[in-house]
Amino acid sequence: MKLEKSVTDAFKNKQAKLFREYLAPEFSAIDVEGVKDADAEIADMEKTDLSNYSFADMKVALLSPKMAVATYKVTTQSTSSGRDTSGTYYAATLWNKRGAKWLAVLHTLVKAQ
């Protein structure tokens, strides 16, 4: 949960360099707009205002000593390009430990109905 909070705080505060440090070179994000690489995710960060967020139902499964998946629900107050994107979303992040550092390889985000 600490990693998810740290990477989300970097996104919220538009800290592109710090945000990128949490992403593997082959990082992909999947959301309603499609599949994005790290550069596209950072471009989205620049046009997003995330004023508040909270996590719920966080579960982390250790798939191997170097792979873990975090699944959770996140509720946001946010806009993207001036459009209200607030709501509740289901999310998952696949993390890979490289050396002493965990990096996000894949992140998915789907708005709850």
Regions found by a protein language model. Name each.
Residues M1-K14, Y22:
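Short, aromatic-enriched amphipathic alpha-helices that serve as compact interaction elements
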Residues D44-T85:
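Surface-exposed, charged secondary-structure patches
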Residues L23, V74-T76, T108-K111:
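Short beta-strand segments enriched in hydrophobic/aromatic residues
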Residues T88-Q113:
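Short beta-strand edge/turn micro-motifs at domain boundaries
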Residues N13-I30, D39:
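Short, well-ordered alpha-helical segments enriched in acidic and aromatic residues
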Residues L23-P25, A56, A91:
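Residues that flank catalytic or metal-binding motifs in active/ligand-binding sites
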